[in-house]
């Protein structure tokens, strides 16, 4: 929620600056508003799902080194998924992929393939979801205002996270107040 609270005045400041320069980034038509809401929903839901998978994976197996490496696989996965969208890959991409997969093997396969833990799968799914989120932002950002997209995205993450917390945890009002700042 903190990001939402920061982005609201940021949008207002950017709007004021743009008005002075004679431009306006506000969505004017219903179609533009719908596109912004859809972009915020898609990007926000992917970000929420990736963050949730990461947090659950770390809860199951709190090896931060492994979690960091598996999560960082999104750096390799984004260009790989980009290949499916018609983007070209360089030789460096393929070398990086091989090195990353070797590192993944050394980190996760201590006792053969069966040694992959459920937390590893969650953290790999986190990397995939972060990759999709980055690709979604790349897709939508030329179509909508970036600051408004960030606001919509973080609003979706905040709402979905709050709903998940209420469904799967038993937070007290004091905990909400304590974590609000």
Summary of predicted features, one role per range:
Residues 35-42, 89-101, 120-123, 144-154:
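Cytoplasmic-side transmembrane-helix entry/capping segments in multi-pass membrane proteins
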Residues 44, 48-52, 75-80, 105, ...:
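Hydrophobic/small/kink-forming positions within alpha-helical transmembrane segments
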Residues 1-4, 25-28, 58-66, 132-157, ...:
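Juxtamembrane helix-loop-helix junctions in multi-pass membrane proteins
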Residues 7-12, 78-79, 84, 115-171:
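Transmembrane alpha-helical segments that form core, pore/gating elements
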Residues 11, 15, 74-95:
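C-terminal transmembrane-helix exit sites in multi-pass transporters
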Residues 1, 31-36, 94, 109-129, ...:
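Juxtamembrane helix-entry segments on the extracytoplasmic side of multipass membrane proteins
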Residues 16-20, 25-65, 70, 106:
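Specific transmembrane alpha-helical segments of multi-pass solute transporters/efflux pumps
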Residues 8, 89-109, 126, 130, ...:
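Hydrophobic transmembrane alpha-helices of multi-pass small-molecule transport proteins
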């Amino acid at each position: 929620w903190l990001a939402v609270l920061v982005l609201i005045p940021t949008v207002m400041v950017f709007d004021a600056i743009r008005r002075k320069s004679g431009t306006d980034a506000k969505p004017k038509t219903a179609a533009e508003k719908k596109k912004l809401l859809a972009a915020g929903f898609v990007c926000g839901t992917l970000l929420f799902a990736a963050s949730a998978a990461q947090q659950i994976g770390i809860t199951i197996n709190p090896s931060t080194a492994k979690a960091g490496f598996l999560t960082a696989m999104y750096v390799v996965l984004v260009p790989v998924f980009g290949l499916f969208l018609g983007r070209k890959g360089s030789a460096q991409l393929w070398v990086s992929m091989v090195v990353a997969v070797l590192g993944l093997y050394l980190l996760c396969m201590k006792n053969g393939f069966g040694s992959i833990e459920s937390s590893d799968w969650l953290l790999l799914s986190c990397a995939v979801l972060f990759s999709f989120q980055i690709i979604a932002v790349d897709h939508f950002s030329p179509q909508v205002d970036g600051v408004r997209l960030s606001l919509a995205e973080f609003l979706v993450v905040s709402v979905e996270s709050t709903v998940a917390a209420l469904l799967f945890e038993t937070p007290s009002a004091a905990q909400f107040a304590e974590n609000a700042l």
